[in-house]
Amino acid sequence: IAIQGGXGYLXQPGDGYKYA
């Protein structure tokens, strides 16, 4: 599920989204 975040997660860039 893609949610709004502040930094990168699971190797994703810090585009403002996190994947959980």
Curated annotation (Swiss-Prot):
Gene Ontology BP terms: defense response to bacterium; killing of cells of another organism
pH dependence: Optimum pH is 8.0.
GO molecular function, one term: lysozyme activity
Temperature dependence: Optimum temperature is 60 degrees Celsius.
Enzyme type, top EC level: hydrolase
Location in or out of the cell: Secreted
Keywords per UniProt: Antibiotic, Antimicrobial, Bacteriolytic enzyme, Glycosidase, Hydrolase, Secreted
Gene Ontology cellular-component annotations: extracellular region
EC number(s) stated in the UniProt entry for this protein: 3.2.1.17
Record's catalysed reaction(s): Hydrolysis of (1->4)-beta-linkages between N-acetylmuramic acid and N-acetyl-D-glucosamine residues in a peptidoglycan and between N-acetyl-D-glucosamine residues in chitodextrins
Role of this protein: Has bacteriolytic activity.
Quaternary state and interactors: Monomer.
Name listed for the protein in its UniProt record: Lysozyme
